[in-house]
Amino acid sequence: MGKKKQMRSEVKGNVKNSIGRIAFAALAVLLQIGWILILMIKLYQYSSVISLLTSLFALVVALRIYGKHTNAAFKMPWIIVILAFPVFGLCIYGLFGHKEAMHKIIRKFEDVDAQLIPLNVQDETILQQLEQEDPLLANQCHYIWKYGNYPVYDTTAVKFYPEAYLGYEEQLKELEKARHFIFLEYHAIEEAEAFARLKDVLAKKAAEGVEVRILYDDVGCIGFLDKSFIDRMNAIGVQCRVFNYVVPFLNIFMNNRDHRKIMVIDGKVGFTGGYNLADEYFNITHPYGYWKDTGVKLTGRAVQNFTMMFLEMWNVMGQADTHYEKYLKASQEGAEDGNVQKASGYVQPYADSPLDGEPVGENVYLNLIKTAKKRLYVATPYLIISDEMTRELGLAAKRGVAVRVITPGIPDKKIIYGVTRSYYSGLVRQGVRVYEYTPGFLHAKQMLCDGDTATVGTINMDYRSLYHHFENGVWMHGCDAIRDIEADFDKLLQDSEEVTDKYRDGRKNMAVRGWQCIMRLIAPLL
């Protein structure tokens, strides 16, 4: 009891310290933005010539945005804001919408990738074999390999966990077997009850000489960790790095967060899924009813893709470690396990970056939707999607595919939940059936196509995940785990309320519809 009380006290202290630091940074950034706006407005009012030039420049910028080869959903909000409020719009676009301003961090990623990508080689015989079995599936794998630089494998076993706590228990068991290295990359870590068990194992393995590294996102850990967390981890032999520190200076990269959830053990076993390392994900706490999350465990060669993802982010955020051989060799040796050699199907872990202009995560979803013939099941905590995604889901339903979309019954963010629901009517009128998970908050991110192809990972169906965050997932076909994924969807549908008829005619309340239209307009920028 005393230990738990002390832990709660430490957690409260962490919350206070981290929120204070973030609040200070946010205030400093707002003051800087305010100062720039005041200066621009003064200049704008000072001279009619400056006013005219600003308006003309706003028009030029708006035309340039219109001509960009980007998603139309991103263009419209910027064009409206810039033309309606030239000074404000130009300032905000210059600070947050101009990706070219991130050339320094983009160069860092390019330098690291130049070393890593040549080491991740695709076995062409696997692609040829898949081409003979199903050309459309081979095309999907070819896309992920060519534009994501992550190979597809056929010697990897996959285990699906329909509940976060089941995956977590298996992670603890596998960590006990670690002999060489442990990599953890998570969006959010809470130094509370769940993490305490993990911390004990990490300390034990570090004492045995196992190399242990943790990478976590600064914003994701707001209210969970303070700066001294790194010192506490270092004291037990665990190396830590923070992804994209929040600083009290204007920084366009601050909007791009590491939303990945990856654990790699000796390059042989890897985990990912929707859950972070915080109590609410394992229903130790219940802020939004029952928390429903899922995950997968990979054993075999495909784990190398996870290793590459981690090493990329680790090296970008600090001093580069170019001794990759020992980590990659371990991944290759993992396939020597006899059980893995008998693994069925194809597995392709992949990652997505907001900096390369290629929305791999969204395109993996779109490719699955386009190839669906009989049924397509989708689980996502947020449904804020592009016109293209809406159209493809609708077309699938129109050509006779049974399309089922499941979202939470209890939201974690009420405003975002309202925006999610605003997309229902556009889908159900095209034949898509929509369900809400009544026991609580559905946080799983997974898609199942025709009962034989699926993806599970961290990628929400919203603009933040699809365009702003660093994400990861696992594409799989013909694996035994897919039967478990299908069973999980069947259980989800049983536990959910169908709301299709309720939204078939759209909302009648004009005020609500007006608010939702505004939120949908700015959603791509959030």
What are these regions (language model features)?
Residues 1-363, 367, 371, 411, ...:
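N-terminal localization/anchoring segments of enzymes in phospholipid and broader phosphate metabolism
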Residues 187, 381-382, 416:
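Glycine- and other small-residue-rich loops at beta-strand/loop junctions that grip anionic moieties
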Residues 362, 369, 390, 403, ...:
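A general structural signal for well-ordered alpha-helical packing
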Residues 382-403, 408, 413:
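Helical hairpin unit composed of two closely spaced alpha helices linked by a short loop
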